[in-house]
Structure formats: structure tokens, C-alpha cells
Amino acid sequence: MASKVYFADLRADYHENLQQKLTRLMKTAGMGDIDFQDKYVAIKLHFGEPGNLAFLRPNWAKTVADFVKERGGKPFLTDCNTLYVGGRKNALDHMDSAMLNGFGPMTTGCQIIIADGLKGNDEVEVPVVGGEYVKNAKIGRAVMDADVFISLTHFKGHEEAGFGGCLKNIGMGCGSRAGKMEQHNAGKPHVKQKLCIGCGQCRKICAHGAPIITDGKAVIDHDRCVGCGRCIAICPKNAVQINWDESAANLNRKIAEYTKAVVDGRPCFHISLVIDVSPNCDCHAENDMPIVPNV
């Protein structure tokens, strides 16, 4: 059965500001019916790539976290590391980026946990019941360790998925680095030779012996490679790369099945704001003008 969707516009006046309006919306939509008492509550959001200003302000996260804490819950803000090079590729840089963009205990009232760990390989394989494109989703461990899951996102364009919102925030956002590779890539990783220093880290972490060091450079044997993506996470020079060759249709199908893996069988609540609808996702280190006004 389809869930009810509750809507409130972004108009405000001196009687009620937008944070108060969001609190009223959460109450009306039944978020208060969830048993938060002594529960670990993951609030999944995007902290924004440094340089981007379209991400949701920390004030929104604080409103949600306060709602949870008032009902005895233990909220934390979370996201997983990125597959590409940037300010959120590992947990240390990711947390620095989050704090640079205003997220922290003082501003949001709760802690930050990067769900897939230091290098993006702390994951749980979650069976996707009825999955056609994904049989076992690779999800950041802290996401699955949480008792309650809340997604907080804003709508925006996306150059591959078309648009990004609740599903992309959950499906792609909760995937570990290997999970993101599975969604974006139809094949297996390769080594960019000019970046490789022949350190052998990829070979050490591979359970299948796929990376081979030849003449001081790594080469991946695709007959042995199973596409787990651990070599991408471990490479100190970002030399192990994917082809980004999955079709848009299959990418969206995989995102949907990854989302199913995250939300199945536990209390969830989803908040989407049609605000700062930038043409590209918040993973960019810049944001263009919104393509539509706030709703």
C-alpha cells in the first residue's frame, strides 16, 4: 500500500518560521509515532562538497535531530564516502568538509558518523529481496546498525540519474564505495598507469589476486576480479578507477534496489524539500542558479 505524502510549502511569516513549520509537518505526518526511546537514529543527508552552497543548511538537520531527542532518541548525522576524488573520499576529509559547511554538534545538536568508515570499505552486505539488478547491496555499516532511519534531502538535478531526491540520497548515498561502484559501473575497475606507483596495496587487499604488479605498475586481471571495489578504496593515488558506463535506466533501477535494502523491515521516515533545486547534484564543488523557485 502506498504511503501518505504530506506537503507544506516554504512560505513563512512572523507567526511561524520554517523550522517550526517543519516540526509541525513531522508531527502531522506521524513521525512522532515512531518509538525513538533509547534508539540509535541515522539521519541520512548530504554534507555538500566544499565550494557547493546548494546543500541543505545545518538548521534543517538540527530541527530533525531535536525532534528525535525530545522523544528519547539518539540521533546522528551520516553519509558514506564518495567513489570519486574530492573532499569526501575518506572519513577524515569527509568530516572536515561537513564541518566546513557548518555541520557539527554545536550547530545540529548531534554527532557525525561516516557510515562506511575511514576508507569507505566498512560495509554490510544486505540481501535485496526480489532484486533483479542487485542481489546483495553493499551498505555502510553505521546505516544498518541504526535502529531507525530518517532521510533528509532536497530535490536537485543530476547529470546521470536525471534528478536526485529521496531515492538517490538513500540508494546511492548509503552505498559503500564498492556499492557506489556497483551502481555506476557496468564492468570492472582498471588502473590508470600514469598515476600508479606500484605500491601493491591493491594486491594486498584483494581476496582474489586480481591486481598484478608488472614493471612497477598494477594491472587488474578481469578474469579474477569480482568487482568488489576494495582496490579503489585502498589506492593512495586514486589510480584505480571505474568506467562510469552504466546506463541511466539501469543506474536508477540499481538505486531503487539499494534503497529497498536500506529501508526494508525497520522504522523509516523521509523528508524531502524542494529548495535550492540546482541543475546538478551537491557532489559538485560549485552550484549553478536554481532551475525552479522554492516550493
Regions found by a protein language model. Give the residues of each.
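Extended, low-polarity segments enriched in aliphatic/aromatic residues
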Residues: 2-61, 66-79, 84-295
